[in-house]
């Protein structure tokens, strides 16, 4: 097992995680094969056992490997059929909440300081109408944030700003049109089904199992678009495993299929690195990625965004390009500043540390 670690490049555990994961996905490390012991691999690579343990734990969190008594870590990702072994895995449900979230609030002092700074620096510019797709500065800041934290590399033109997920759902439906049948997780956030119903499109309810959309339901559905919240589905708290994510990607590989990926609550992963996005995993440019800042900053902020596949940018422009951006210019510049100066990511890291501490007690 030859892995190359650059100790000058941080974090080291993510280098190891990425290389092992690639071997698993590419079937170099096959289903049920045993990984080296933590101590043996640490000695071979000249790194600490803590580093190896952290990499293995992340692989386990994402469903690529599992820890077995007296056997150590073994590969649980099965490329042949797309499902991780679940025989010895206990799945815990963490129901999500719709109202007041359990995460520490974004510091009001930081928010007010940033607002004053933006007012001072940008003045009358803040009274001007926003470009229809959102301010370029915010779209560029989101682009850089996604590249740093979610493995998503896109052009600024692919990012559209809107006032929350409901607004963006409606625009996605109008863009893709009524010729599609939409598959929705069941149960899911109530307003999702209400939006599809109000839009008068055909949709199916796809039941959830312990690791994402039920296998049989996904294989039998007539839907050509699936709407999924893979990191943490509301209200069940179900998270899609790595195997399930790859299954979704394979499902969408057929012609004229799309995935709408709502990355709800992924920022609050207990692991340092959240689960891979479907947008990053897919190589066929058929995933529409969506997220908001309602949980991470405040529901009253009403700022969301979606990332379009490149080939849909022109379609969006032709069908919906005339719509004005519904987010005030002032709040767009405030969020831009929070993303660019690091305050947003510092808050996320504080929340993660608190969550890890709470889990340990």
Kindly label every feature range from the protein language model:
Residues 125-255, 267-268, 273-281, 285, ...:
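Conserved core of the PLP fold type I
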Residues 40, 232, 311-312:
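Short, well-ordered alpha-helical scaffold segment located
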Residues 70, 282-315:
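Active-site PLP attachment segment
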Residues 260-261:
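Hydrophobic residues in beta-strands of the RecA-like P-loop NTPase core, especially within AAA+ ATPase
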Residues 1-118, 122, 127, 138-140, ...:
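N-terminal basic, amphipathic alpha-helical segments
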Residues 77, 98, 208, 230, ...:
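Active-site donor-binding loop signature of nucleotide-sugar glycosyltransferases
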């Amino acid at each position: 097992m030859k892995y190359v670690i650059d100790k000058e490049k941080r974090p080291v555990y993510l280098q190891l995680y990425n290389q092992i994961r690639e071997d698993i996905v590419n079937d170099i490390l096959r289903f049920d094969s045993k990984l080296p012991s933590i101590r043996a691999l640490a000695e071979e690579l000249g790194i600490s056992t803590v580093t190896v343990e952290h990499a293995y734990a992340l692989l386990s969190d994402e469903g690529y490997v599992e820890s077995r008594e007296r056997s150590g870590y073994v590969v649980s990702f099965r490329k042949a059929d797309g499902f991780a072994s679940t025989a010895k895995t206990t799945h815990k449900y963490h129901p999500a909440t719709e109202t007041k979230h359990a995460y520490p609030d974004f510091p009001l002092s930081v928010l007010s300081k940033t607002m004053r700074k933006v007012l001072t620096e940008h003045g009358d510019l803040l009274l001007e109408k926003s470009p229809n797709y959102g301010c370029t500065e915010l779209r560029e800041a989101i682009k850089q944030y996604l590249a740093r934290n979610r493995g998503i590399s896109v052009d600024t033109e692919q990012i559209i700003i809107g006032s929350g997920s409901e607004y963006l759902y409606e625009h996605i439906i109008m863009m893709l049109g009524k010729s599609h049948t939409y598959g929705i997780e069941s149960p899911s956030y109530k307003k999702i089904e209400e939006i599809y119903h109000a839009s008068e499109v055909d949709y199916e309810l796809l039941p959830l199992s312990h690791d994402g959309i039920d296998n049989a339901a996904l294989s039998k559905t007539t839907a050509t678009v699936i709407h999924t919240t893979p990191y943490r589905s509301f209200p069940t708290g179900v998270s899609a495993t790595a195997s399930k994510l790859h299954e979704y990607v394979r499902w969408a590989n057929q012609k004229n299929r799309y995935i709408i990926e709502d990355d709800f609550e992924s920022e609050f992963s207990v692991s340092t690195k959240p689960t891979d996005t479907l947008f990053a995993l897919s190589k066929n440019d058929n995933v529409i990625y969506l997220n908001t800042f309602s949980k991470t900053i405040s529901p009253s902020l009403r700022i969301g965004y979606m990332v379009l596949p490149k080939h849909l940018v022109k379609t969006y422009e032709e069908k919906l390009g005339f719509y004005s951006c519904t987010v005030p210019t002032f709040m767009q510049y405030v969020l831009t500043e929070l993303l660019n100066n690091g305050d947003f990511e510092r808050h996320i890291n504080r929340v993660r540390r608190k969550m890890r501490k709470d889990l340990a007690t």
